[in-house]
């Protein structure tokens, strides 16, 4: 091949590759990963000052430790959050919300029996604490107790049938019992709902009503700012990951769980359990291992 023709061939190939990469970047829906805000940092500093003072009753100190733990958790600082929750519980052992968080952490670590006990404690202290049914249901789901998981997640769904994510978690549990029946129940829940919340688009994808491309187009159109985009992506990528996992497509599932985590929406259920899914899939790199141990 003559030098000039060879150069033209290489230039054309590079141009086509560049166009392909550019096209991919333009079509991909991405958000800037969420970062700590100045307001959150100021609140943490103020909490530290208040906790350092001695002018707090035990109840006030326990409550403030809990609130700081919640803030740490939202920033992904689970070791610090767990330390605050443990201190709060040592002062006031009757705080159901603290047991709820500790149960979530135990589930993420794969310590399911201890997680069940934590959520049992939540409901003993406050039978109306409905999110304990969600979190215990998820722990039972990952712990392989499918029928018990269904019972808890059904109770959680019945508390608000218009919440699409309650239907999705119930479907995931029932899918392990009878996939065909689970999809029919999901369809009934969709038809009965008001369909106002964004997550019903994910349900429509699960039902085969819309394509993945349409789902992502709706996601992009619905997001009002970067925060809502990051949240929607965390949710959507997690449930897409579960969908592909059910098809046996481990590579796609793994990639989607990583994308769910990448948005840093630390306090979302989908972020928490995308990490667990990656661990179960063998993606236990150092950062995942540290997360499970905290």
UniProtKB/Swiss-Prot annotation:
It is a lipid-anchor. A lipid is attached at residue 19 (S-diacylglycerol cysteine). One of its GO terms (cellular component) is plasma membrane. Keywords: Cell cycle, Cell division, Cell membrane, Lipoprotein, Membrane, Palmitate, Repeat, Signal, TPR repeat. InterPro entries: Lipoprotein_NlpI, TPR-like_helical_dom_sf, TPR_rpt, Ycf3. It comes from Escherichia coli O17:K52:H18 (strain UMN026 / ExPEC). The gene is nlpI. The keyword Heme does not apply. It is found in: Cell membrane. Gene3D superfamilies: Tetratricopeptide repeat domain (1.25.40.10). It comes from the Bacteria. May be involved in cell division. May play a role in bacterial septation or regulation of cell wall degradation during cell division. Residues 1-18 form the signal peptide. This is Lipoprotein NlpI. Pfam families: TPR_16. A lipid is attached at residue 19 (N-palmitoyl cysteine). PROSITE patterns: PROKAR_LIPOPROTEIN, TPR, TPR_REGION. GO terms for biological process: cell division. TPR repeats lie at residues 62-95, 96-129, 234-267. Homodimer.
């Amino acid at each position: 091949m003559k030098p000039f023709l060879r150069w033209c061939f290489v230039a054309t190939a590079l141009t086509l590759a560049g166009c392909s990469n550019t096209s991919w970047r333009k079509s991909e829906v991405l958000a800037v990963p969420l970062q700590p805000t100045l307001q959150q940092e100021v609140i943490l500093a103020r909490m530290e000052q208040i906790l350092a003072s001695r002018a707090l009753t035990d109840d006030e100190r326990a409550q403030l430790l809990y609130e700081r733990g919640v803030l740490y958790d939202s920033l992904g600082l689970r070791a610090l959050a767990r330390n605050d929750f443990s201190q709060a519980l040592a002062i006031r052992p009757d705080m159901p919300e603290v047991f709820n968080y500790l149960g979530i952490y135990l589930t993420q670590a794969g310590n399911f029996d201890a997680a069940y006990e934590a959520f049992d404690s939540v409901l003993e202290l406050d039978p109306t604490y409905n999110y304990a049914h969600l979190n215990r249901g998820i722990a039972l789901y990952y712990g392989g107790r499918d029928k018990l998981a269904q019972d808890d997640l059904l109770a959680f769904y019945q508390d608000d049938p218009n919440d699409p994510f309650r239907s999705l978690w119930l479907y995931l549990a029932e899918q392990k019992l009878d996939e065909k029946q689970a999809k029919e129940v999901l369809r009934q829940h969709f038809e009965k709902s008001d369909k106002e919340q964004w997550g019903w688009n994910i349900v429509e994808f699960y039902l085969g009503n819309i394509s993945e491309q349409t789902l992502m187009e709706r996601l992009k159109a619905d997001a009002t700012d970067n925060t809502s985009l990051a949240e929607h992506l965390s949710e959507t990528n997690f449930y897409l990951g579960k969908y592909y996992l059910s098809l046996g497509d481990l590579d796609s599932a793994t990639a989607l769980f990583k994308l769910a985590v990448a948005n840093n929406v630390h306090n979302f259920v989908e972020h928490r359990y995308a990490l667990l899914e990656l661990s179960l899939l063998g993606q236990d790199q150092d950062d995942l291992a540290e997360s499970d141990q905290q």
